[in-house]
Amino acid sequence: MDRIIQSPGKYIQGADVINRLGEYLKPLAERWLVVGDKFVLGFAQSTVEKSFKDAGLVVEIAPFGGECSQNEIDRLRGIAETAQCGAILGIGGGKTLDTAKALAHFMGVPVAIAPTIASTDAPCSALSVIYTDEGEFDRYLLLPNNPNMVIVDTKIVAGAPARLLAAGIGDALATWFEARACSRSGATTMAGGKCTQAALALAELCYNTLLEEGEKAMLAAEQHVVTPALERVIEANTYLSGVGFESGGLAAAHAVHNGLTAIPDAHHYYHGEKVAFGTLTQLVLENAPVEEIETVAALSHAVGLPITLAQLDIKEDVPAKMRIVAEAACAEGETIHNMPGGATPDQVYAALLVADQYGQRFLQEWE
């Protein structure tokens, strides 16, 4: 099996970089469709338009309808084709960005992505998650290429609720442990091959960055200011984790997240908040040293991520619910089968309950 790493063509990050969008995007195309969150366009549209105009580019702005569905993609395609746009810029949150990526793919044109939050590692990936108009999961759209450009304005990210940054840390915290597991098992990653040394190194750097800078970055996020620590964590959440998960591989942590979606209790928690508990579960499954489990739990707790089931509002009928979660996490095609030696529902059930016990014990010690 060949080793493969893939990543966006260019990654650009800085405070007020939105003012320089036009000059960065100019080499890709002259006429652009900008698909933006209505909320983001509310404060950024004039800046975006000025940036394009100053660079001599033609821009058409289309507010995102709210759901990354095939109908929404087709609607936006009509606007883009009428305006003869030769490239797409997505600006906003995850569904907006996934829509922009899918739209550009169907049109066969370049795409640039400008995330305004750092809550997941999705912006850099060659993947869009497609939903129905009602918001039900429809399918994964695997794209042939990563975005041509990912541009992150750290000042805009700093303006978002701090909990979103914490969720991004939760998502990124899994990257090293899942890549490490895939490296040990020789699993095939989403890039279509085995992981490279480079992908593993980025995944490990991601983890070390979160350990060193995570708590400091959260203090900045709570004050909505940009500091060197916040800059580093935004890069870890977005780029290091993005390349790390796609080319390093996913394992138990994300499968446990998917299992948790099979029960209603934790539905209102963010992706990364559920992944954080999934990471603790994976470490128990691997029989990791207790020091490693405690280090991960301590970082999670410090930035406000859940380390017990109760913190995910799973408080009643816990054993029965964990059976459901464990079965769903071990479904055919789930990433848990990338673990060395695989995993059975019984093993995952045990790991879920023990991870919860660890979390409860740490909370008693720390509080």
UniProtKB/Swiss-Prot annotation:
E.C. code: 1.1.1.6, 1.1.1.75
pH dependence: Optimum pH is 5.5-6.0 for dihydroxyacetone reduction and 9.5-10.0 for glycerol oxidation. Optimum pH is 10.0-10.2 for 1-amino-2-propanol oxidation (for homooctameric form).
Cofactor: Zn(2+)
Residues that coordinate or bind NAD(+): 37, 94-95, 116, 119, 125, 127, 131
One Pfam assignment: Fe-ADH
Entry GO terms, CC: cytosol; protein-containing complex
Cofactor remark from the record: Binds 1 zinc ion per subunit.
Residues the record lists as binding glycerol: 121, 254
Domain of life the protein comes from: Bacteria
GO MF entries: (R)-aminopropanol dehydrogenase activity; glycerol dehydrogenase (NAD+) activity; identical protein binding; zinc ion binding
Pathway(s): Polyol metabolism; glycerol fermentation; glycerone phosphate from glycerol (oxidative route): step 1/2
One GO BP: anaerobic glycerol catabolic process
Catalytic activity: glycerol + NAD(+) = dihydroxyacetone + NADH + H(+); hydroxyacetone + NADH + H(+) = (S)-propane-1,2-diol + NAD(+); (R)-1-aminopropan-2-ol + NAD(+) = aminoacetone + NADH + H(+)
Keyword terms, alphabetized: Glycerol metabolism, Metal-binding, NAD, Oxidoreductase, Zinc
Upregulation: Full expression of gldA is achieved by induction with hydroxyacetone and stationary-phase growth conditions.
Cross-referenced Gene3D superfamilies: 3.40.50.1970, Dehydroquinate synthase-like - alpha domain
The protein's assembly and partners: Homodimer and homooctamer. Forms homotetramers in a solution containing 5% glycerol.
Note: This enzyme was independently isolated as a glycerol dehydrogenase from mutant E.coli 424 and a D-1-amino-2-propanol oxidoreductase from wild-type E.coli. It was shown later that GldA is responsible for both activities.
Entry's family note: Belongs to the iron-containing alcohol dehydrogenase family.
NCBIfam families assigned: PRK09423.1 (NF006941)
Protein name: Glycerol dehydrogenase
Lineage: Bacteria, Pseudomonadati, Pseudomonadota, Gammaproteobacteria, Enterobacterales
